[in-house]
Every structure is written in structure tokens, then in C-alpha cells.
């Protein structure tokens, strides 16, 4: 695992972080160089951003040492008015973690139009005072991310605290 500081709105360091995430084959633990709030010294309250993707599943697997030691794990999915096909798998992951003794809940949270997926994730982490955000890193073309926004790039540009990313 690589541990790496990132600076808010610093594309040079964010590009280094992205290369490590997408090319190393290992999870990357990121923290803001100048955090807005005090960084946790242990990961007791963990948020897992779940979208049903292979990178999200890999992130959960990579984070197991942290998840087993946590006091509370919240797996959350962003929803809109349509049913989420990933919801069933999210509940299964939560049940599996619970069977291993992890204090875990799964919840689907409605994402409003005023939030990008990145700002939605950042708000969730802040609202639940999460010590660590675990999420899969998914890469889009730079043009698509520029137009639509991307969760990975967004949290790298504005890290809410400790983030563990896996691809």
C-alpha cells in the first residue's frame, strides 16, 4: 500500500496520485496535505462508497484489515428515482462483513441534482464524521470527466480526509 499526501486543487500531485492508483495494482491511502478538519489517528468510523463496480469490490477487499478493526462501517450508495441494481450486492457485502463480526450498515442515500457524485460523497463523509473513506477508483477519459465530473478525480481534488482507493 502506498501512502500519499495530496494538495487541494494541485493537478501535478493529483496526477501522481492517479498514476499510482491506476498503474501500481495496489491500494493507495491518500490524505490532504492541509486538511480542513483534523485527520483521524485511527479508523474507527469508516464510510465505503459503493457503486457495485469491480473497483468498489476490490476496495472493500483491500480495506478488510481496517474494516475488521472499525467500530462502525457504513456502506452507502447514491440513488436517484430509479432502482439501483448494485443495491442487492451492497446488502450482500454488508451481510458478509457482519458475519465476520464487522459492525456494518448499508444504506441507499438519495443524491439531489445539486450535488455532483464527488460532492455527494464528500458531504456523506462529513455528515457521518467518517475517519476513512474507502472507494473504488474508476477512470474515465479526461474529456468525459471534464464534462460530467468523476468521483475519483473529485475526491482527489478536494479530499475530505483519509481516502483509500483501489483499482
Where are these regions (language model features)?
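Glycine-rich, Arg-bearing micro-motifs that act as flexible, cationic patches
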Residues: 3-19, 135-154
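Intrinsically disordered or low-complexity boundary/linker segments at protein termini
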Residues: 1-76, 158-167
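Conserved active-site loop/cleft motifs that coordinate metal ions or position small ligands
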Residues: 132-137, 163-166
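Secondary-structure boundary/capping motif
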Residues: 12-13, 55-56, 85, 117, ...
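Redox- and metal-dependent alpha/beta enzyme cores, enriched for Fe-S-associated oxidoreductases
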Residues: 52-107
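Glycine-rich phosphate-binding loop signature in dinucleotide/nucleotide-binding domains
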Residues: 124-130
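Short beta->alpha junction loops
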Residues: 107-115
Amino acid at each position: 500500500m502506498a501512502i500519499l499526501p495530496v494538495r487541494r486543487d494541485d493537478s501535478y500531485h493529483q496526477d501522481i496520485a492517479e498514476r499510482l492508483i491506476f498503474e501500481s495494482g495496489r491500494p493507495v491511502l491518500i490524505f490532504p496535505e492541509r486538511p480542513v478538519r483534523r485527520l483521524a489517528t485511527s479508523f474507527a468510523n469508516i464510510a465505503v462508497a459503493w457503486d457495485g463496480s469491480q473497483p468498489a469490490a476490490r476496495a472493500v477487499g483491500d480495506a478488510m484489515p481496517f474494516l475488521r478493526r472499525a467500530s462502525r462501517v457504513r456502506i452507502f450508495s447514491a440513488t436517484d428515482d430509479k432502482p439501483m441494481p448494485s443495491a442487492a450486492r451492497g446488502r450482500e457485502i454488508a451481510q458478509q462483513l457482519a458475519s465476520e463480526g464487522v459492525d456494518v450498515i448499508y444504506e441507499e442515500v438519495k443524491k439531489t441534482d445539486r450535488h455532483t457524485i464527488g460532492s455527494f460523497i464528500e458531504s456523506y463523509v462529513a455528515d457521518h464524521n467518517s475517519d476513512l473513506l474507502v472507494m473504488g477508483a474508476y477512470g474515465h477519459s479526461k474529456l468525459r470527466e471534464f464534462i460530467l465530473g468523476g468521483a475519483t478525480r473529485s475526491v482527489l481534488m478536494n479530499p475530505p480526509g483519509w481516502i483509500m482507493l483501489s483499482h
